[in-house]
Amino acid sequence: MSDSPTGPWKSMGHIMDRTWRTRGNHPGIIEYKGQSYVFGLNYDIMHLKTFRHHERRSVSAAPMYYNADGSIKKVPYWLDNVLEQVEPFNPFRKVEAETMAWGYGLKTIETGSDIYVSNIDEGEYLMLKGVDFRKGASRFEANVSNSRGRTAYIEVRLDAVDGPLCGTLKIDPAKGFKTVGCSLKDAKGVHDLYFVFKGEAGHDLFVWDWWRMK
């Protein structure tokens, strides 16, 4: 800590205490809409599958607060924090498919300036938290490429992977990317949004660029 950007500096200790769960020394601090956040690395997602050590770190975030003298209050370990959603998510616009709070099984690929969701297999899903459908969404559209020769589907569900089904988007085989849509029902208010993937091919069902609600 210092009164000058060029020092002299005084060490004030750790922002987050070292424990067996903490790994890496690559933090980042930002301020977003009046709230400070600290980012860092850990193995928590890898530990959902195995505790055998290998380098599969993921990024976590936590709210960060300052004392009156400008020093930083100690931040609890990532999983011990409550990270509140800043505001409801707006689905009534073009949303890149790789936007997610959680994804199961799928991967992303980068092609030039574009990023796509790929490696989509039967039963996998993508989830967004706190999506505000307002008074109701009546249509879901997605820009996809299905070159597998077998029909695929995106189920639009609320609040759980097996939650209420609002609509099912059918993706027929075709060359290149195309925009397809389906009608929705009972999609209103604020919910967690699940896109659940099904398909006759079983694996590598399609590649997904973007989506929007209407």
Named regions from a protein language model:
Residues 1-214:
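Carbohydrate-active catalytic/glycan-binding domains of CAZyme proteins
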